[in-house]
């Protein structure tokens, strides 16, 4: 119908919000200290909500609870090695600039020089304190975009969070965090990097194929799949349409059927965002088949 939220209409709306956000962000930030997030650790007391939360935790051992999809971001101002694409800090790229503002706000991070990385970690600790004792978060490292020759490209990477930083944050705060490595399978040293991650206590590997330039069905991934299966670590991989992280912007790599190659190599695969948007070619009907919804 006329009110259907098509991809084109959604992009137009997001672009408008981004432009509007640039105008309003300074005003809201000055008046409230953040953009929109009130930065509370706990929900306001509400009987219905309290009962729902109590029911959700019933029978769950919080010591075995791990929120396994938590991005670790920042600006690199702590010497963490984090990199952010310059477009996310440029007014000439309003959508990505606005995204950066929203992400920082969501993490209750403020533009205090030298404190952004640390403030983000402190906010996550604050949120864990609002959970049941023993619950932890799985922090994601995030590798750069790489081309088909395995060469990293900072210009095509939205952001980069080193494995070493994710490992260090988790090691300093084991009561709050565990960590997941991010290793591009086209890298010459991908198998060695995986061995180092396993030795450092990584519990999983994180990919975002459309942003990182990873075709999960490519034979280039085979040696990494073999090493990952041998290590017994799961692969947490995005599938579906990707809007939050541009990077390489190769949406076809979000086709969930491409991950069958990992399964065929014995890798345990967690498909992230399986209630998300997006359409892809139904490869079971051939590569020239029409596109269908990624998830039904």
Regions found by a protein language model. Give the residues of each.
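Catalytic pocket-lining loop regions of alpha/beta-barrel enzymes
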Residues: 203-204, 217-296
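Well-ordered, non-membrane alpha-helical segments in soluble/globular domains
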Residues: 95-96, 107-126, 156-168, 221, ...
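Hydrophobic faces of well-ordered beta-strands that scaffold small-molecule active sites
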Residues: 66-68, 137-139, 179-181, 205-207, ...
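N-terminal secretory signal peptides and thylakoid transit peptides that target proteins
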Residues: 4-20
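Active-site-proximal loop/turn and secondary-structure-junction residues that shape catalytic pockets
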Residues: 143-144, 183-185, 209-211, 239-243, ...
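An N-terminally biased module of ancient metal coordination in phosphate/nucleic-acid-related enzymes
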Residues: 12-15, 28-140, 146-157
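Acidic, His- and aromatic-enriched active-site or binding-groove loops in soluble protein domains
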Residues: 162, 202-211
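Acidic (Asp/Glu)-rich catalytic clusters
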Residues: 125-133, 162-175, 194-201, 224-230, ...
């Amino acid at each position: 119908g006329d009110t259907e939220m098509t991809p084109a209409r959604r992009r137009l709306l997001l672009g408008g919000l981004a432009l509007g956000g640039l105008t309003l962000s300074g005003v809201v930030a000055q008046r409230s200290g953040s953009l929109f997030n009130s930065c509370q650790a706990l929900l306001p007391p509400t009987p219905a909500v309290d009962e729902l939360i109590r029911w959700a935790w019933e029978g769950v051992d919080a010591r075995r609870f791990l929120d396994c999809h938590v991005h670790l971001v920042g600006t690199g101002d702590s010497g963490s090695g984090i990199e952010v694409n310059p477009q996310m800090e440029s007014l000439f790229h309003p959508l990505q600039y606005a995204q950066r503002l929203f992400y920082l706000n969501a993490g209750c991070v403020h533009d205090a020089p030298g404190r952004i990385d640390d403030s983000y970690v402190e906010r996550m600790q604050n949120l864990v304190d609002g959970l049941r004792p023993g619950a932890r978060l799985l922090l994601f490292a995030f590798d750069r975009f790489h081309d088909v020759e395995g060469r990293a490209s900072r210009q095509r990477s939205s952001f980069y969070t080193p494995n070493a930083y994710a490992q260090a944050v988790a090691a300093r705060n084991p009561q709050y965090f565990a960590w997941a490595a991010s290793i591009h399978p086209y890298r010459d040293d991908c198998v060695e990097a995986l061995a180092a991650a396993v030795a450092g206590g990584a519990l999983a590997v994180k990919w975002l194929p459309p942003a990182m330039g990873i075709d999960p069905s490519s034979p280039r991934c085979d040696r990494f799949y073999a090493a990952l299966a041998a290590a017994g670590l799961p692969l947490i991989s995005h599938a579906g349409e990707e809007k939050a992280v541009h990077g390489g912007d190769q949406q076809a790599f979000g086709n969930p059927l491409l991950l069958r190659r990992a399964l065929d190599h014995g890798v345990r695969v967690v498909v992230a965002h399986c209630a998300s948007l997006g359409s892809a070619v139904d490869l079971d009907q051939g590569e020239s088949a029409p596109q269908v919804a990624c998830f039904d």
